[in-house]
Structure formats: structure tokens, C-alpha cells
């Protein structure tokens, strides 16, 4: 079976979130997007299926939200990126399932993964001030990032 890779990267434009440079330290540290991640967190709380959401906490290049949906764990990595040529300021959300060793060994289907992607899509599509929402798979994202 030749299945299309999942589109788990969403790129969008918005002036709702800050592009302010850090006052101290090296350029771009901490990464931009904490306010965007906090916004997504608050909007995800409105969905009944989301039983837990923690963060945002800072990783090396993104702000991460830890989400539990229907007993399944996911991470949302939220960050700023220059996309396309010529480069355009964009926001990116990368959605990843978090599985333990047993989950990877037995590859049980994730029943709630598509629901989480739909919830994120609904948040972005219905928020005034967010535009140019594009879902991509890893290869598509790598080609524009």
C-alpha cells in the first residue's frame, strides 16, 4: 500500500504574535512563538477530547505543548520560520505523536491523531488575523524551510 505521508506541519501567517527581538543574549534566543503557543493552548482547551495540555515550555528551537487526547500523548512544536523565496515571516506548528517503546514496537493505530490535526486546523481557520494556512508533510516542509 502506497500511502501519502501525513500532513503534520502547518504553516501560516499572522501579525497576532510578537516578532520582538530579545533584549539580551544571542539573536533569536529564546525562539519566537511563546505567545503563539499560549494562544493555541488556550484554544485547544475548548475541545472536550483534550484531557490535558501543558506548556508551553522552551525547547532548542520551538515552544512545546504536551497534549493528551483520548489517552494518547502528542507534542505540538510552535515556532517562527522564514518560508519560501523570497522569505516570508511565518508561524509553524509541528504535530508529533509521543509513543513509548511498546507503542513503536506494536504500531497500534493512533485513534485520535486526525482529531487533533482537525482541532488545530479549526483553530487556525476560524481565527481572524490568521491567513495563508498550509498543511504539509515533512518533505514539503523541508523544501520550503
Q: What function would you assign to each model-found segment?
A:
Residues 6-23, 27, 63-145:
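Long protein-protein interaction modules used by eukaryotic assembly/scaffold proteins
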Amino acid at each position: 500500500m502506497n500511502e501519502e505521508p501525513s500532513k503534520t506541519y502547518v504553516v501560516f501567517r499572522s501579525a497576532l504574535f510578537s516578532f520582538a527581538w530579545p533584549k539580551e543574549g544571542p539573536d533569536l534566543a529564546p525562539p519566537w512563538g511563546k505567545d503563539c503557543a499560549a494562544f493555541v493552548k488556550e484554544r485547544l482547551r475548548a475541545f472536550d477530547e483534550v484531557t490535558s495540555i501543558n506548556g508551553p515550555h522552551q525547547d532548542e528551537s520551538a515552544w512545546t505543548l504536551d497534549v493528551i487526547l483520548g489517552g494518547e500523548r502528542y507534542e505540538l512544536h510552535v515556532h517562527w520560520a522564514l518560508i519560501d523565496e523570497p522569505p516570508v515571516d511565518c508561524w509553524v506548528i509541528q504535530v508529533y505523536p509521543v509513543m513509548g517503546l511498546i507503542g513503536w514496537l506494536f504500531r497500534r493505530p493512533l485513534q485520535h491523531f486526525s482529531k487533533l490535526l482537525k482541532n488545530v486546523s479549526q483553530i487556525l481557520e476560524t481565527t481572524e488575523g490568521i491567513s495563508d494556512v498550509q498543511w504539509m508533510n515533512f518533505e514539503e516542509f523541508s523544501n520550503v524551510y
